[in-house]
């Protein structure tokens, strides 16, 4: 993950203001240490609740930055896919945590020693990596909302123009696409699109200007979308694609654990709300509570 996110450090753009709830973390650590659930086959709910809350906050922020309000069904799709991504992230996190339970002789470490060993690794999961994911969710949810507008306007503004990055230090890989104008349904947009690199700040604008030629790519292998970003979130509602390492290269049992957890705990299209004082979900039926039925409700 460090290699994947290496170039994503954001020193000039999105302000990723979040704090991972320590009460949730401490409950999760206690549960993992006491082996009250199986990290290979289950999803730790406190870690999930907090991760999903933060990714949802990023999505809210990104949508608020777009000039287009998305409809309820598309917002539900974003929320549901964010829940799936959060569950995969937590499966990776909880198994990384559990892998440090025993010393080199296979003996269970004392709880405080184990926590001391775990915290440097947790800094990656709940700080560095999550910050990159937060910033990316902000940018890509804004792009997703923009795409919804492009679809609605395509009878009047049928083409899209790739706009120059707003970054003070833009990467050279997208520069060849600046100024390209193509129809919204052109296959080019399936393989190249703003937001397919970590921390990309390029964008699209709808236009009735005539289409340009498809640009030649001198380095097609180098200009492939980054793993986890090789999709159009405005079409499928996934801010992180299925090629993300949490999903494509997860621990054994990750896909089955996530499938079971989502089916049991997450109503499609819901937003999860947690009472951190009690550590319990606010829905007494066994599934997480739907806290809104409208985008801004």
Feature locations, PLM:
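A broad, low-specificity signal for short, low-complexity segments enriched in glycine/proline
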Residues: 59-61, 120-125, 158-168
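Internal glycine-rich, Lys/Arg-flanked active-site/core loops of soluble domains
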Residues: 103, 112-115, 119-136, 140-156
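N-terminal leader/targeting and assembly helices and adjacent pre-domain segments
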Residues: 1-122, 208-297
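Intrinsically disordered or highly flexible coil/loop and linker segments, enriched in small
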Residues: 38, 64, 106-107, 127, ...
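Conserved short secondary-structure elements within globular domains
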Residues: 137-210
